[in-house]
């Protein structure tokens, strides 16, 4: 079954229209999606190239060892998502909600973050390299081994954040 079909089936399942919970493993995708409910969807060792997601819910989802290149996420809700060992390259995040998320071993390279929120999130070994953006907010963000090398953000507001054992 294609990655697209698995994703669309999960949306149907969440909306009570049949389908089945998504367990995407070792798949690849390059499609555009809008208005999907992918809450609790599990993605593992999958690659996305040029995929776009608009007004999509990823709450309580789990992503492990995924590769995303040139993808866009507009007005997506990633609250309580758990991501581990994922790499985002040249991806754009606009008005994305990542509150209460957990990022482990993730890397963002040459990505754009606009209107992002990371309230109450927990990061471990997260690299944000050569990224840019504006209006990135986080209250009570916690993180160790966080690296923002060569990244530039306007209106970056971290309140009560504790990164790399600093106040």
Residue ranges and their predicted role:
Residues 3-9, 15-167:
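Tandem repeat scaffolds
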């Amino acid at each position: 079954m294609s990655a697209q079909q698995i994703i669309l089936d999960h949306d149907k399942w969440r909306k009570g229209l049949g389908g089945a919970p998504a367990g995407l493993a070792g798949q690849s995708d390059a499609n555009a999606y809008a208005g999907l409910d992918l809450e609790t969807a599990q993605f593992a060792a999958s690659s996305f190239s040029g995929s776009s997601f608009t007004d999509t819910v990823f709450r309580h989802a789990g992503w492990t060892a995924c590769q995303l290149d040139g993808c866009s996420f507009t007005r997506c809700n990633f609250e309580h998502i758990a991501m581990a060992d994922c790499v985002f390259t040249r991806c754009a995040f606009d008005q994305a909600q990542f509150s209460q998320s957990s990022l482990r071993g993730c890397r963002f390279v040459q990505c754009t973050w606009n209107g992002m929120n990371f309230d109450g999130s927990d990061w471990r070994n997260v690299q944000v390299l050569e990224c840019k953006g504006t209006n990135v907010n986080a209250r009570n963000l916690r993180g160790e081994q966080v690296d923002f090398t060569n990244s530039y953000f306007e209106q970056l507001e971290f309140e009560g954040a504790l990164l790399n054992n600093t106040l």
